[in-house]
């Protein structure tokens, strides 16, 4: 109910904040459906959380992932056949309600979630409730900060530019957020396992696994950023047309944020696994810093300024403040900076060397012109293979990367 109420209030705020919203007919009906759909997802949040905590995340992904695929397929079909956006939103509503009943049925019929009376004192109950309240409050602040960072850019683009820029910017962000969704699924899937691993390990073993995770995700961020740089404009052109592409300079700025969103994942994994959510004000600070610098720079240089503002908040909070807080809790405050640098410095140097090599050879790669989807797939194959080989070859010189690869091979084979 609280989410629904906040959404309605924000809707009225947007009406007065963004002038071009008035040009869209039935805009408040559309907004109401979006808010209702979002609030309904909280109806089964406790069920999906219980399954995830019980290391049944694969069940959650099957329901949510399968539901999403089916919903999107029906939405595309309705848009093509009826051109009715209200029906598009109604499908989302029905899908969320169906998922709620599926989750509820699983929880009610799973013996692991049956309430069994246990001998626990009132003091212990009070302690558990207080700890749970604190962790929920801390998590709430983290989520609010994330929403501020991810969504203020759209509002600022609408305010300082216009809705046509929102369409162009949103098209790129839709592509980039595929990476975020995939990474989030991976984080949720392995967090419980990492938490179990950390319980029985000493500092040296924890340090070793932290180095491996950071090295691998920096390598992955390098690979993703390279492919996005050489392919995203071709994809947008093939998808919705050449008039919707952005300049290479703006694309590079956006990819800096994509790079940061991937290399931050080890920190998120260890934070979720250890439960160190005490840095409750960092996410809010991140949102405020992002809003301030993005609005200030947008006034002078437009869209690049908005993206640079997000980069500034990402660097200050995501890459500096949050990791230092987490590793201070894990290894001691005075060891935090030293540990953090030992995790990221060497792989970042490898990454920048690879970026430099591709930058000076970019003309040869960009020269591959794309005029249809077959050309795009061909270019995708070539760029992906070349970048994968180079990234793997360079990072394989790092012992932590080799250790992680061997660990994966042992699990697979």
Where on the chain are the PLM-derived regions?
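Helix-loop junctions and terminal segments of transmembrane helices
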Residues: 52-53, 111-115, 176-214, 268-273
